[in-house]
């Protein structure tokens, strides 16, 4: 199904359709058109998709649809085992995925949990012991919970590797292998990656069974919504050039600052640049690995809310 007009044609339940309508979803994206029917059929999937293509809904909606017959309002943890596991490379992606799935499932009793490192493990353990049907996790923290027996994966029937290329880049392959060995052999496997590198294909060969390959963006392509321009600038003039660019292009038609992300190659550079931009009158802050998880989440929230303009 390469072309589709609306979500109703997938046979999704009314409570899922009403939730995505509230979220402003109208016409499915290319990967949603291709992936949702295949996931509903129970096939393994190897999906290639860039950021901003609607990837989360392409697996989140059919997975929720498949769980609905098992959904219940019981308070017994035994009635809410982990049935779907979504592995994410970072805390931020795990949070974003959990938020999206919680919105899709808002009109259902399906429980969704998220666990990652850098924060207190006790509240996560308590939530897991109460039971969750869908668990979004970073590999290392999930292994911590499995070792502490806060949860088990004995009834997990669907496993999703999200942004698998990033997980390999970050050295998570040994952790992923340990997790996969703890899962039932009979399960549905979905893997999504921005690229189909040789390493990803090797992982797919070990992880997926007769997968349907879905690719909606050219390998190594930039998301279609991004316009690329290159400016040749002397090393010593880069900050001045950036300031000039922000002054000339950093506002919308009403004169309000546009949300801007500036990437640099080092934490020290990020801190220095944020200070320089603040001195020039811009509302800027730096995000990097030396900040605590709470600081990073607050900064991301401020950027999302528009309280912070340049990150």
Indicate residue ranges for each PLM-predicted region:
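Conserved helicase RecA-like core
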Residues: 1-311
């Amino acid at each position: 199904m390469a072309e589709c007009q609306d979500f109703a044609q997938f046979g999704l339940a009314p409570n899922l359709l009403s939730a995505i309508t509230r979220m402003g979803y109208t016409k499915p994206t290319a990967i949603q058109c291709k992936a949702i029917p295949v996931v509903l059929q129970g096939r393994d999937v190897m999906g290639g998709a860039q950021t901003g293509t609607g990837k989360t809904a392409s697996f989140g909606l059919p997975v929720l649809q498949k769980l609905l017959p098992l959904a219940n309002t019981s308070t017994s943890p035994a009635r809410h085992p982990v049935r779907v596991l979504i592995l994410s490379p970072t805390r931020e992606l795990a949070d974003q995925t959990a938020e999206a799935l919680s919105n899709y499932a808002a009109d259902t009793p399906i429980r969704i949990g998220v666990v990652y490192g850098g924060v207190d493990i006790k509240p996560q353990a308590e939530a897991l012991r109460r039971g969750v049907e869908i668990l979004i996790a970073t590999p290392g923290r999930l292994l911590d919970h499995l070792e502490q027996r806060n949860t088990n994966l004995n009834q997990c029937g669907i496993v999703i590797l999200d942004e698998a290329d990033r997980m390999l880049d970050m050295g998570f392959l040994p952790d992923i292998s340990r997790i996969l060995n703890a899962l039932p052999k009979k399960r549905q496997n979905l893997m999504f990656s921005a690229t189909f590198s040789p390493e990803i294909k090797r992982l797919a060969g070990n992880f997926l069974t007769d997968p349907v390959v879905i690719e909606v963006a050219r390998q190594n392509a930039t998301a279609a919504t991004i316009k690329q321009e290159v400016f040749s600038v002397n090393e010593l003039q880069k900050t001045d050039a950036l300031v000039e660019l922000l002054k000339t292009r950093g506002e919308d038609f009403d004169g309000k600052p546009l949300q801007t992300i500036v990437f640099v190659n080092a934490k020290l550079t990020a801190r220095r640049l944020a200070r320089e931009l603040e001195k020039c009158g811009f509302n800027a802050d730096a995000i990097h690995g030396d900040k605590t998880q709470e600081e990073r989440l607050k900064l991301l929230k401020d950027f999302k809310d528009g309280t912070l303009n340049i990150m």
